[in-house]
Design a protein with these regions (language model features):
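Short basic helix-loop element that most often maps to the first helix and adjoining turn
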Residues: 9-28
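Conserved hydrophobic/aromatic packing and binding residues within compact polymer-binding modules
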Residues: 11, 25-26, 36-39, 65
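Helix-turn-helix DNA-binding elements, focusing on the entry/boundary residues of the two helices
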Residues: 11, 22, 33, 48-51
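Recognition helix of helix-turn-helix/homeodomain-like DNA-binding domains
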Residues: 31-44
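Short, conserved catalytic or interaction motifs in soluble domains
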Residues: 41, 60, 70
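DNA major-groove recognition helix of helix-turn-helix/homeodomain DNA-binding modules
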Residues: 50-64
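Short, charged recognition helix plus adjacent turn
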Residues: 66-76
């Protein structure tokens, strides 16, 4: 399991499920849009503080961003 990829995939999934653009989401988090884009694409590491900011903006518990989906695991 690549935790950075899992986090980025989950961030994108939760953000899109809420119909929020990267730009609008970055504003909600107080982060830059290019940072959100880089995290979603596994190009940037993320601090614990920013994980919490993102979780708060999404309205989810932080740990939910770190859980690999069953169907992703099956693909290997």
């Amino acid at each position: 399991m690549d935790i950075v990829k899992v986090f980025g995939d989950n961030l994108r999934k939760f953000r899109k499920a809420r119909g929020i653009s990267q730009e609008a989401f970055a504003e909600l988090c107080g982060l830059h849009r290019t940072y959100i884009s880089a995290v979603e694409r596994c190009r940037r590491n993320i601090s614990i503080e920013n994980i919490q900011r993102i979780a708060d903006a999404l309205g989810v518990e932080a740990y939910m961003l770190l859980i690999e989906e069953e169907n992703d695991n099956a693909r290997g």
